[in-house]
Amino acid sequence: MAKRNRKSGWKRAGAGNTINRTFKSTLFIMLFEDKNNLLELYNAMTGKHYTDPKLLKINTLKNAIYMSMRNDLSFLIDGRLSLYEHQSTYNPNLPLRFLFYISQLYSGMTKNDNLYGTAAVKLPPPEFIIFYNGEKEMPERMVRKLSDLYTFKTEEIRLELETVMLNISGDNNAPLKRACRTLRDYAVYTDKIREYTKTMELEEAVELAIRECLSEGILKEFLEKHRAEAKEMSIFEYNQERHMMQEREAAWNEGREAGRQEGMEENLREIIRNMIQQGLSDEQIISYCNITNAELEKYKKG
């Protein structure tokens, strides 16, 4: 029996099935907080064949102090520190957010070490992965760097952080999804919701997606155990995604009216430049940035 706590969280009782929420979670987090699912995903990402979930040490930021910048998933295994993030709305600022996350994680790992001593403090090498399944068409694989956000380019970059975004919508990254059934099922489920919302109300679309997935064996065990919570999370996430898109559009319009067009255009120009470097087609760039073909040509020349 699931009980809602006073902070809009969740607490589910049961051996080996404890889920505590003091924040509004996402379906992606809920699925991959399960160590069996997370190990399956890590194996698919790395080509490893680990079978013991106990090898995973999950260290996702959960301290209330850092609640405003809580990351989705981070864990240690194989001497590496992996940070996985899910995005349904493309965000070019994720390299900066990952910098904040890794700083807090390293700080926690070394709190008992002598940082002023003569012995070198050893750190696990990190990797930063973003799983994207938004409505906007994006490339199958895209690299974003912290230096993409710098106000100007320098010959020698003193601080860099590289992220890899993997598009899991539709037919993208099919080999990865074949290697990780949970990721594939999650992608199918969210694709169904997005498709059905084109012709029906959100709650009805989510309910239909859940029924179909149960009958097709997609996330079957998970949805049987957590159907009500999964439905609520899905509705919340989709509403949040639409809200973020509306906020971004409103901010753009506000920037025009407030006379900040030059700064916003420079930011858009940098985004377009990066998309071109990543191999996106003109049609994809026009769709994502909501610009005309003539405007795209202007940004290319600028």
What are these regions (language model features)?
Residues 2-302:
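Elongated, amphipathic alpha-helical interaction scaffolds
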